[in-house]
């Protein structure tokens, strides 16, 4: 991977700002997308026990945290060329025995959600920047529990 550019970081930041514009709505888009592709994922998130509820503060907090961590990963990539995930994240994901296909489902849901959030500002360049940031974030989590 080449260096993560200032423009790529700015693109990721702009998608984060769009997401923050309506966290409850975009949290629903995100988790609905996950459950459509992987219904069993419902068992991985305690706050999905009763379905996707936009008024559930745990649902919106988790989505906000994840999307924020992807944004932070873009900043780490720009500053350091690598992402270092928190060991606690590695531990949690290790306990749930997550595999690559599950990380892919989350990535696809994240992209779908942010595409909706940014609307006509969506570009291939934005998609690539988000994919790089997410992939490096996921790799950091996996490394933390390897």
From Swiss-Prot:
Recorded hits in SUPFAM superfamilies, A to Z, give:
Globin-like
UniProt modification remark: Nitrated mainly at Tyr-31 and, to a lower extent, at Tyr-26 and Tyr-134, in effective nodules and particularly in hypoxic conditions; this mechanism may play a protective role in the symbiosis by buffering toxic peroxynitrite NO(2)(-). Nitration level decrease during nodule senescence.
Q: In which tissues is it expressed?
A: Root nodules.
Could you name the Gene Ontology cellular component terms for this entry?
A: cytosol; nucleus
- Domain Globin: from-to ranges: 3-146
One of this protein's Pfam families, by short name? Globin
Indicate the principal place this protein occupies in or around the cell: cytoplasm
Modification Phosphoserine, positions: 46
Q: Name one GO molecular function term.
A: heme binding
**Residues the entry annotates as binding heme b:** 46, 93, 96
* UniProt superkingdom: Eukaryota
InterPro entries assigned: Globin, Globin-like_sf, Globin/Proto, Leghaemoglobin-like, Leghaemoglobin_Fe_BS
**Positions bound to O2:** 62
One of this protein's GO BP terms?
Answer: nodulation
Post-translational modification Nitrated tyrosine, affected residues: 26, 31, 134
State where the protein is found. Answer: Cytoplasm, Cytosol; Nucleus
Swiss-Prot/TrEMBL keywords: Cytoplasm, Heme, Iron, Metal-binding, Nitration, Nitrogen fixation, Nodulation, Nucleus, Oxygen transport, Phosphoprotein, Transport
| Keyword Transport tagged | yes
Function description: Leghemoglobin that reversibly binds oxygen O(2) through a pentacoordinated heme iron. In root nodules, facilitates the diffusion of oxygen to the bacteroids while preventing the bacterial nitrogenase from being inactivated by buffering dioxygen, nitric oxide and carbon monoxide, and promoting the formation of reactive oxygen species (ROS, e.g. H(2)O(2)). This role is essential for symbiotic nitrogen fixation (SNF).
Its quaternary organisation is:
Monomer.
Protein family per UniProt: Belongs to the plant globin family.
> Per its record, how is this protein called by name?
Leghemoglobin
Q: Which organism is it from?
A: Phaseolus vulgaris
